[in-house]
């Protein structure tokens, strides 16, 4: 299927180094962006008239907790992934499938490996509403061998996570070996930071743990739900090069502390946005949009940069092609505009004012998944007009 998207008012790239691009049209073929420019006029199966509104990459949720299927036992909710798609989310990155009913917490090594393999294989075969669920994240526990990391890499698992590992065992050196084994195989390492989570058995981790283990991603550094102390957050920004995750489940005040440190150190490219849902915070279809609006409207992040934190920064930190609108990338994108009654001029101005915009279309791999209007946002002021070629 080919798609021509024309009359774009503002193109937000998702690239934090170049967050806006001057172009009014975009052509998609075979699920990827083939061309971006001005006045593109190519025959297409689907023509989308953006009517001068904003186009941005599909949102990449850096921190989600799927189990199996479009259902979460954490809130006994059906269809949550489909609802997130209507909130502009096109990729979900699993921070562990730890809400599986009956899962021993913490799991032993054999159980943790089995769960990661099973989740990886199941989510390779299922995409609710077309959403890409990057699952099979291994929960790191004592007792793993280097050969286990060979198996993870062979299965295509690309993320492991410290959350239940007993840090009293750090002097043994096993945790550092896990990081080295993962890195040698192209597997990213995430670390649950801050206080204890809903499970009651996650391990507390502040700056000292982060500085020792040096994960690729510091999970919910602003709290999930409780953050590390302010001085620790500042130390992690200043003293490491780890990616810094901001989640909807966390402490809003700590986001302001984090962003002050990020500005001081020019670290905007390290900030990632996630929801840390489903969980005790609930199911949040608009969670990613709300976090962008908070960063732009309260933390004074330029809105196109805040979008990059929820798209391209996340993709880059996790080694994914998704999150940036440029030639050759997956055609995952969102068309959106201000909501009727908003004082904003457009979607980016809405974010800058702390408002939510309204979504009129979502494409994943070039296929329309939401059209007309989202089920999860108010309608946009100027909905996109979609025409399909007959025959």
Language model features with spans:
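N-terminal metal-binding scaffold of metallo-dependent hydrolase/deaminase domains
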Residues: 1-42
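Metal-associated gating/positioning segment near the N- to mid-region
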Residues: 42, 50-114
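Short, acidic/polar
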Residues: 73-81, 141-152, 200-209
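Active-site core of metal-dependent hydrolases
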Residues: 157-263, 267-282, 299
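His/Asp/Glu-enriched, well-ordered alpha-helical/loop segment
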Residues: 260-339
């Amino acid at each position: 299927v080919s798609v021509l998207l024309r009359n774009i008012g503002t193109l937000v790239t998702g690239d934090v180094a170049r967050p806006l691009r001057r172009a009014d049209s975009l052509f998609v073929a075979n699920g990827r962006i083939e061309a971006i420019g001005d006045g593109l006029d190519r025959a297409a199966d689907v023509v989308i008239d953006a009517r001068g509104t904003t186009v941005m990459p599909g949102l990449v949720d850096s921190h989600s907790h799927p189990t199996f299927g479009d259902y979460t036992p954490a809130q006994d909710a059906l269809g949550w992934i489909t609802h997130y798609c209507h909130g502009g989310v096109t990729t979900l990155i699993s921070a562990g499938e730890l809400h599986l009913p009956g899962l021993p917490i913490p799991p032993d090594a054999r159980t943790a490996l089995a769960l990661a393999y099973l989740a990886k294989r199941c989510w390779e075969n299922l995409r609710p509403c077309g959403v890409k669920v990057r699952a099979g994240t291994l929960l790191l526990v004592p007792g793993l061998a280097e050969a286990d990391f060979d198996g993870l890499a062979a299965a295509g698992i690309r993320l492991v996570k410290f959350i239940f590992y007993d840090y009293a065992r750090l002097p043994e050196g096993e945790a550092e070996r896990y990081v080295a084994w993962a890195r040698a195989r192209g597997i990213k390492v995430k670390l649950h930071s801050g206080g204890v989570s809903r499970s009651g058995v996650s391990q507390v981790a502040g700056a000292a743990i982060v500085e020792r283990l040096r994960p690729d991603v510091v999970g919910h550094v602003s709290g999930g739900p409780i953050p590390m102390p302010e001085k620790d957050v500042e130390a992690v920004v200043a003293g490491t090069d780890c990616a810094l995750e901001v989640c909807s489940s966390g402490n809003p005040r700590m986001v302001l502390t984090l962003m002050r440190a990020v500005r001081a150190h020019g670290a905007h490219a390290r900030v990632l946005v996630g929801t840390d849902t489903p969980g005790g915070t609930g199911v949040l279809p608009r969670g990613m949009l709300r976090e962008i609006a908070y960063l732009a409207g309260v933390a004074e992040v330029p809105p196109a940069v805040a979008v990059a934190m929820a798209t391209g920064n996340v993709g880059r930190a996790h080694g994914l092609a998704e999150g940036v609108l440029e030639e050759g990338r997956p055609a995952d994108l969102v068309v959106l505009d201000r909501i009727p009654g908003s004082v904003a001029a457009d979607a980016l101005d809405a974010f800058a004012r702390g408002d939510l915009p309204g979504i009129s279309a979502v494409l994943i791999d070039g296929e329309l998944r939401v059209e007309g209007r989202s089920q999860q946002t108010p309608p946009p002021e100027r909905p996109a007009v979609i025409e399909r070629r007959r025959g």
